[in-house]
Regions:
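Histidine- and acidic-residue-rich, metal-dependent catalytic cores
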Residues: 13-200
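Heptad-repeat alpha-helical coiled-coil signal-transmission segments
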Residues: 1-3, 7
Length: 200
């Protein structure tokens, strides 16, 4: 049991190391990994307390999605610096390149964790990396999943990701106040997100 705990601790540290490496390449992200991980934790715990998807959002699920959240942008390793670190808005072509980070992220997770015996963790890590840009109305990427087709873990990750993007400063935009960011997300319920309002 002690050996298993040591392995899990080492795995967690390795994951955070990889996540921080990605973040260090992208000056736009700032504390994105840490922020989104905290938001995912808050959302997952609140959803569990509210009895949302009780058959899915268990105590184990909350722990797994918290630990998987830092890997959601791991696929950005595959994106060239000239695009990833661009301080201005991306062109249509550049955005198409950015979009591949979701599928690349899923592939990387399966490769990195192929020797891991924790299949539930691999599944959730794969989901948050691959599907956190899917939208409830089917207009997201990479697969254009609709509604309930989108894994719950990815839906939670999506809200955390968008909330952090809205409240962070960019060269081309000022941060939205938290209240306004929540209002924007709530207004998009049923279109970009599932019809349950964010639980901050």
């Amino acid at each position: 049991a002690l050996q298993h705990k040591k392995i899990k601790t080492m795995q967690s540290k390795t994951i955070m190391g990889i996540a921080n490496l990605i973040e260090s390449r992208d000056s736009n992200t700032g504390t994105h990994v840490k922020n989104t991980s905290n938001y995912v934790s808050t959302l997952a715990k609140a959803a569990k307390s509210a009895g949302i998807y009780p058959e899915i959002i268990t105590e184990e699920f909350v722990n797994l999605v918290e630990n998987a959240a830092p890997l959601h942008d791991i696929g950005k390793i595959a994106i060239p610096d000239c695009i990833l670190c661009k301080p201005d808005k991306l062109t249509t072509e550049e955005f198409e390149q950015i979009k591949i980070h979701s599928t690349e992220g899923g592939k990387m997770i399966l490769k990195i964790l192929e020797d891991t015996t924790d299949e539930k963790y691999i599944k959730i890590a794969y989901e948050v990396a691959t599907y956190h840009h899917e939208k409830w109305d089917g207009t997201g990427y990479p697969e254009g999943l609709v509604g309930e087709e989108i894994p719950v873990s990815a839906r939670i990750m999506a809200i955390a990701d968008v909330y952090d993007a809205l409240t962070m400063e960019r060269v081309y935009k000022k941060p939205f106040p938290k209240k306004k960011a929540l209002e924007i997300i709530s207004n998009d319920a049923g279109k970009l997100f599932y019809s349950v309002p964010p639980l901050f």
